[in-house]
């Protein structure tokens, strides 16, 4: 089935960086940037200018050269400059050779033939999620893929029908789980087991998750959690939770929307059954771009022991694009799935989407998740240090609800404001040329992305953020 696209294994113990008394100066931030080996990547992205992020017309390059501070990659990543080149190559292919683009490689194009483009993107994506290329399929959108994989992996019985999930999951995940349960004839109020945060905390501890598994294992069919919780930014211990749940007889799936491209993953080595993710956040493939799916190789096997006409394989919702390429165009209505995750594909994927994704992933091919995570470690720790150094312990203006432990988070810090401050503060930040993400109730999610953000960005953000807080206090 091929080899695992390995990244360096992350250490289980991550030491948080410490900073000197001079850390709260512009000169210190600039000195960190000067030593940053990843600063070479910033120029490969288009950073919106402060003027352009406020305009109500198509962006004009001449409006301003002063870049905005863009800390919203956890919602939508910035556009890589190479995307335009790749898209133009696709348009030129379509206009010049039309249908022949499906099967013909062009010598001067950065793209492979359309029929192989999804497979190529899967190979690019595999190292990012720690999987074999055959275990990755690039297809659909995140919630669509979640439905497709739950159709295969959620197999409830009257004795075991529950799904263990997080309390206040991202709404689309909640809807998908609820509808799958209803579709099988069960009551969501009884079958949805929601794990709430620990008392007095916004975090859900691994211990509480394991206790919940113990409590409900005999009646549970599936454990489905996010790799990183979208509101708090908490990174779950995927390896430990997966192994424990499987030891109790549960199938385990993960929504990696906020984890893929953000933190090191080893889905194959961790024995995860299935996972889904989007590519428009940390992978920077564009709004609504095509998504990814992972299926462990043991679930993608096709057994021909009873002959070529009687393949045995795991049940899934079938479509022609999941058929083996050797017989996909025979049109004989005899489904022979492609081995691996590609056998779970349904429809012909959008080449425009694949083109944008392949362009974005070409930058990841120049680095590694190990290198990315090292900068994330330092960049987010610096942001945390500056924020906390000016937040009064007697009467704090905000609270960081993301875990302080760097092994339990990625790039995002979720800043919980006092009630009623969110809209006013967000407007002030936007007016100052800062793009961050607000999430009701009362949270600003700040995500400095290591591929294109700098330590100077972090320093400038904190100065503006503190001034905006002071104005809110005075109002």
Curated annotation (Swiss-Prot):
Pfam families: KYNU_C
Cofactor: pyridoxal 5'-phosphate
UniProt keyword Hydrolase present: yes
Binding site for pyridoxal 5'-phosphate: 142-143, 170-173, 255, 258, 280, 320, 348
The protein's Enzyme Commission number: 3.7.1.3
A single BP term in Gene Ontology: L-kynurenine catabolic process
Chemical reaction(s) catalysed: L-kynurenine + H2O = anthranilate + L-alanine + H(+); 3-hydroxy-L-kynurenine + H2O = 3-hydroxyanthranilate + L-alanine + H(+)
Protein location: Cytoplasm
N6-(pyridoxal phosphate)lysine modifications at: 281
One GO cellular component term noted in the UniProt record for this chain: cytoplasm
GO molecular function annotations of the record: kynureninase activity; pyridoxal phosphate binding
Pathway membership: Amino-acid degradation; L-kynurenine degradation; L-alanine and anthranilate from L-kynurenine: step 1/1; Cofactor biosynthesis; NAD(+) biosynthesis; quinolinate from L-kynurenine: step 2/3
Functional description taken from the UniProt entry: Catalyzes the cleavage of L-kynurenine (L-Kyn) and L-3-hydroxykynurenine (L-3OHKyn) into anthranilic acid (AA) and 3-hydroxyanthranilic acid (3-OHAA), respectively.
Quaternary data: Homodimer.
Family membership noted in the UniProt record: Belongs to the kynureninase family.
HAMAP family in the record: Kynureninase (MF_01970)
Protein name: Kynureninase
Gene symbol of the encoding locus: bna5
């Amino acid at each position: 089935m091929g080899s695992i696209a390995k990244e360096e294994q992350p250490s289980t113990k991550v030491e948080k960086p410490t900073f000197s008394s001079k850390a709260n100066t512009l000169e210190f931030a600039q000195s960190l940037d000067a030593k940053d080996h990843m600063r070479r990547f910033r120029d490969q992205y288009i950073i919106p200018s402060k003027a352009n992020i406020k305009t109500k017309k198509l962006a004009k390059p001449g409006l301003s050269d002063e870049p905005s501070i863009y800390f919203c990659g956890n919602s939508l990543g910035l556009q890589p400059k190479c995307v335009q080149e790749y898209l133009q190559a696709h348009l030129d292919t379509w206009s010049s050779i039309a249908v022949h683009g499906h099967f013909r490689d062009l010598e001067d194009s950065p793209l492979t033939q359309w029929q192989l483009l999804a497979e190529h993107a899967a190979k690019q994506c595999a190292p990012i999620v720690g999987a074999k290329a055959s275990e990755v399929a690039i297809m659909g959108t995140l919630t669509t893929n979640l439905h497709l994989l739950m159709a295969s992996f959620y197999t409830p019985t009257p004795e075991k029908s529950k799904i263990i999930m997080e309390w206040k999951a991202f709404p689309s995940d909640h809807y998908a789980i609820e509808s799958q349960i209803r579709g099988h004839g069960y009551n969501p109020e009884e079958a949805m087991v929601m794990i709430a945060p620990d008392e007095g905390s916004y975090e859900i501890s691994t211990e509480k998750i394991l206790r919940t598994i113990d409590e409900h294992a005999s009646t549970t069919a599936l454990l489905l959690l996010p790799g990183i919780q979208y509101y708090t930014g908490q990174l779950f211990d995927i390896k430990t939770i997966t192994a424990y749940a499987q030891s109790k007889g549960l199938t385990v799936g993960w929504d990696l929307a906020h984890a893929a491209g953000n933190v090191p993953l080893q889905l194959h080595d961790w024995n995860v059954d299935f996972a889904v993710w989007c590519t428009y956040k940390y992978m920077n493939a564009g709004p609504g771009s095509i998504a990814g799916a992972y299926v462990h190789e043991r679930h993608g096997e096709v057994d021909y022991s009873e002959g070529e006409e009687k393949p045995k394989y795991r049940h899934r919702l079938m479509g022609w694009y999941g058929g083996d390429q050797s017989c996909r165009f025979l049109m004989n209505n005899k489904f022979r799935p492609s081995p691996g995750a590609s056998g779970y594909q349904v429809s012909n994927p959008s080449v425009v989407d694949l083109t944008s994704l392949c362009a974005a992933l070409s930058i990841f091919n120049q680095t590694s998740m190990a290198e990315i995570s090292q900068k994330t470690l330092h960049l987010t720790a610096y942001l945390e240090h500056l924020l906390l150094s000016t937040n009064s312990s007697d009467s704090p203006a905000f609270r960081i609800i993301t875990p302080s432990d760097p092994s339990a988070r990625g790039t995002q810090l979720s800043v919980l404001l006092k009630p009623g401050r969110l809209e006013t503060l967000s407007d002030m930040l936007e007016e100052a040329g800062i793009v961050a993400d607000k999430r009701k109730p009362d949270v600003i999610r700040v995500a400095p992305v290591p591929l294109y953000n700098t330590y100077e960005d972090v320093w400038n953000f904190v100065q503006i953020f503190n001034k905006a807080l002071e104005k809110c206090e005075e109002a």
